[in-house]
């Protein structure tokens, strides 16, 4: 497998001058992790935040959204896997994102697939453990709404102006893929603070 993202967190920088209350700053790695709605357990998002990657004070926010298509009770599962990305700003606890979908692939095999924009949304956090993903799809589904998010994996490094995070090395965490089957891959979260490893494929 080839690695497309490597990040090492050496320190957590607090932007207390521009952050209000306990809302977290989106230009920090600490929001990276697994998030879900307990009422809809079995689906959720894997979030990656790369601080200052776009420019000083501007992060790359990207994620994978594991969910399902609408189906009658008892019908066959119809999984849906979307990806999204946007640019987080220092001093802001929300970020607009574009939602993408890859279609036409095969399990762990060719062909390579390309992402197609199918909607937009806003990812917002009230604190280091709770957030909301609002979405509007522009494809034929016409779906619109929002889903609450609760942190699934333990918080280690997320910081606000009232609650600093701790340092941790997440060097192996990130997105991994095989170039021959680009359009699919795994998200790896290695959390040294909680001595846990989570992999989504």
Describe each PLM feature range:
Residues 21-201:
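Mature soluble binding/inhibitory domains
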